[in-house]
Amino acid sequence: MGARSESLVGVVLLFQLLADRLWCAATASDSLYDVSYSITAIKPRVDEMVSVDTHMYSHRWKRQSVDTNRPSVGQDFPDMFLEGTNENGTEIEEDTDHKYYTSRTYGPLDSASRDLWVNIDQMEKEKVKIHGILSNTHRQAARVNLSFDFPFYGHFLREITVATGGFIYTGEVVHRMLTATQYIAPLMANFDPSVSRNSTVRYFDNGTALVVQWDHVHLRDNYSLGSFTFQATLINDGRIVFGYKDIPVPVMQISSTNHPVKVGLSDAFVVVHKIQQIPNVRRRTIFEYHRVELEMTKITSFSAVEMLPLATCLQFNSCSSCVSSMIGFNCSWCNIPQRCSSGFDRHRQDWVENGCTEESKDTVCDDLLQTTGISHHTTTGLHATTSIYAFTTTTRMASHFPSNLPTEDDTKIALHLKDNGASTDNSAAEMKTGTLHTGLIIGILILVLLIITAILVAVYMYHHPTSSASLFLIERRPSRWPAMKFRRGSGHPAYAEVEPIGEKEGFIVSEQC
């Protein structure tokens, strides 16, 4: 019994090794450009595969020196700012991204740098929360609920994820590769709060703004550089402020070997598609559609960066206001989701599935007017009109996925969406596909059971060579079959079976990920 149990354990370990090898192969590509973070205090994770595809779309930057009458963060946090900075004002360098944000960088001599820094030490101590786990771990992230709606790239957030690596993750799909996209990064680097007793990660929410501060944190791979103190402030009007108090070395000198080094913003949309071979399992692919990269040479002690949100299509709630908008986007209105969009936001999959890429912004509003006129034309034909409208809606739903998409990016995304594109008219095909999936699973299970049975029989014969079952199989091995004997004597060359003089030791080398 002892030998048999050891054999079973060996079989289990063999399958575990194969599973680990497959997992390593699946995640190897992600590890090339990202690092893994552990998530604490979140909802149970859904067992789904997540991959990150960092597609970048070109955007222009404009640099100029300007004066500003921007509202100060002091309106949200009065009398709680860093003291001792120089009051002399200098020119403000404005980097204008003509898409989603305008960034303004203030040097250590700018008075605005003092105004934008929130002195968290002067706040009510009972309202300042020091996160115990983040302050004592490495590569850890935790969910934080907001008391207000925070607009990020036009989307309203009520929950964020604060990471020890100097950034905030803003995505709804929580995965381990948080540094890839969907982040707010005042200074993303390989910080480890656990290496020093003075290192903390704390935050404060006063109902209109959230301040997250990384206080006296050190780099894990270069502790001798000194401690960093910086913060990110998220304001309910969409403004984002990065404040820097202690930056002991130029940011360009921070190593990115073990962790990405980034300063800026990023957002992405998620495409969910099914896997044909495995039912009830979905795969999420994350596409980055925009990124703001700030100049790292401008990040110094007592400097600050303010990012002002620009108008987006998502803020328009009607067809007329959408198509007549004069902003930096080509806004279009889609009837089915009742949404205004440029086509690239977090609702991208819904936009493509509903055929919104085919709708013209010049004719959509006219269609809405015609539909309204039909509904008020007569009351006697109410039932007939309702039936026609339902039929039209069903037809539209059946053709949600466009047959001819205008751009290469749309085509690539559509290929992912086809896995989800089963319409209401294809119920029979769905049942057939479900039957095929069931048969495939049963076949795989039978094959696995046969392989396990063969392995167990071989192990049993090895440990019990004199048993009746072993002798029975040995006497009926293929070399004893009549056909094999006839072939051996038919003039065809054959190899003779010989017993080895001495046994050779074999070994298996297993590599870990």
Swiss-Prot record:
GO terms under cellular component: membrane
Keyword Membrane appears in the UniProt entry: yes
Domain of life, source organism: Eukaryota
Signal sequence, renumbered to the chain: 1-24
First-listed, main subcellular location of the protein, grouped into a coarse class: membrane
Residue positions with a glycan: N88, N145, N198, N206, N222, N330
Entries under InterPro entries matching the protein: Plexin_repeat, PLXDC, PSI
Membrane topology (UniProt): Single-pass type I membrane protein
Coiled-coil ranges per UniProt: none
Listed transmembrane segments: 439-459
Locations listed in the record: Membrane
Name of this protein: Plexin domain-containing protein 2
Family assignment from sequence similarity: Belongs to the plexin family.
Domain PSI: 312-357
Keywords: Glycoprotein, Membrane, Signal, Transmembrane, Transmembrane helix
Ranges in the topological domain labelled Cytoplasmic: 460-513
